[in-house]
């Protein structure tokens, strides 16, 4: 029995040392202690692509389909530190709630919706960490998961209007609170859907002194669930026509547009990004790209993406003139602290490329 206990103690101690050593690996140079550790040649090819750097990330703690890592404040502090070293700023809370699950005890939702009372105030925690590391924080809205999908757009709007008022009153004093994220993700022209973006976005800006608003819709391409189930993918021309109409409806309510980049094939991406930039310029929006750092090509949902695939997308974004790159998302798929070993390796490859 004692032998078993000693074995477990040794094993856990080893795991802790490994986790600690992963955290020290970061893109910002740090003072190195002289060791006998062997260095290795990367064998990089001479004409390898040159991507643009990732400068922002989503925070996916109220998750749709990504497993939770069950982090507390200590673990999140370590991850914010790793983000900062990689040059990430801002961080964007992808949503304040989804269905019954909410990020903080929002009274406007607890009083009207059938939601669970949360054990942790995630918004206060994230804002406190963003303050500590001098990072900007964008607050993501509540996604009912039902009203807007059922055509009850006004109900979705009213919930988020009340949420904006409560959140700004409670958390607006934080220096890091610098923007809003409109969480409902759409791809094609949906009747009255743009009304949510317009009304909620304008209200958020009015309440907060014109802080920036951001959306991250997806392209109706070959890798969307709908197309893989038999629907027809949008051509580049169709994508331009439909989003020209949507953006015209939300003009003045959205400042940053960051299309998700994972629903089209790698060789198609550049053409869609060029159109996205053209549309953003037309409507005086900043054009970012949402670089998905998870792999849609695998049969398992979802694992960290292969470095070569990420580099292909970063290069396409650079050539298309994207103004910034945000990833979905660092903590699961790129962090040296992630539960996925591949994420730490992706972080290493990324740092080798950009340092």
Which residues fall in each region the model found?
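N-terminal export signals
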Residues: 6-28
